[in-house]
Amino acid sequence: MSPRPANPRVRDALLDAARSEFGRAGVAQARVEDIARAAGVSKGAFYLHFDSKEEAFREILHRFLGVLEDHSTRRREAELRFERDVGRPGRETTLQQTLDLDCKLDAELLESLWRNRLIVAALDRAAGPPCLDIVSDFRRRMRSMVGSRIALKQQEGWLRADVDPEVIVDVLLGTYEGYARRMLGMKAKPDFDRWARAFLSLLYQGIRDPSSGARASATHT
């Protein structure tokens, strides 16, 4: 008799249950039977869909990182629309217009981190090369992508050219990783627009080219 085929709905239920259990107990301490019970299925049903709890965690992790990459892609598309419809930051737009756009996009990122905060909790407890390698590879890709965008904005005169782009990337990624961990102890969702605006207002004071504001003001007069 051929094995019973996996059920996509059961698989998703198991992943939801695993996400909660991993966030509560960590991957090492989580038990397959607890995951299966929370999903309303048997332990055998778990092994019909996954070879191990580590495999389930890797799929959860890949989905989470995929959400972050999708956001990065949507962000770039939004920036290009903004440049087309409103103007280029530092040249044809005001600081407030650019800040409002970045706050909106960063608040969306924080919403994604909030929805996936249990994964962040599990990652803090995870050990072993497979998961760490996946996250390290993701960080490298994000660093490269963000660094390229920062360098481009420096070339266009929107950001100061005398600041190392890698330092700006460290500040950006470090801040939002810190925000993600700050969420772990929270029961009520915070005001993400306020978080984003506070950070970006401070960041812009340090890295924005002062002359870009004068150029933008001249464009609007």
Task: List each language-model region with its residue ranges.
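N-terminal intrinsically disordered/low-complexity leader segments
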Residues: 1-9, 16, 79-89, 211-221
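Hydrophobic alpha-helical connector segments
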Residues: 59, 72-115, 169
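Amphipathic alpha-helical packing segments from all-alpha helical-bundle domains
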Residues: 108-115, 130-156, 166-170, 194
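Short helix-capping/turn signature of helix-turn-helix
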Residues: 50, 123-129
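Short hydrophobic/aromatic patch on the recognition helix
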Residues: 40-50
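Amphipathic alpha-helical segments enriched in hydrophobic/aromatic and basic residues
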Residues: 22, 31-32, 43, 53, ...
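Amphipathic C-terminal alpha-helical segment
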Residues: 112-122, 148, 152, 169-190, ...
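Basic, helix-initiating cap at the start of DNA-binding domains
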Residues: 1-25, 29-41, 54-55
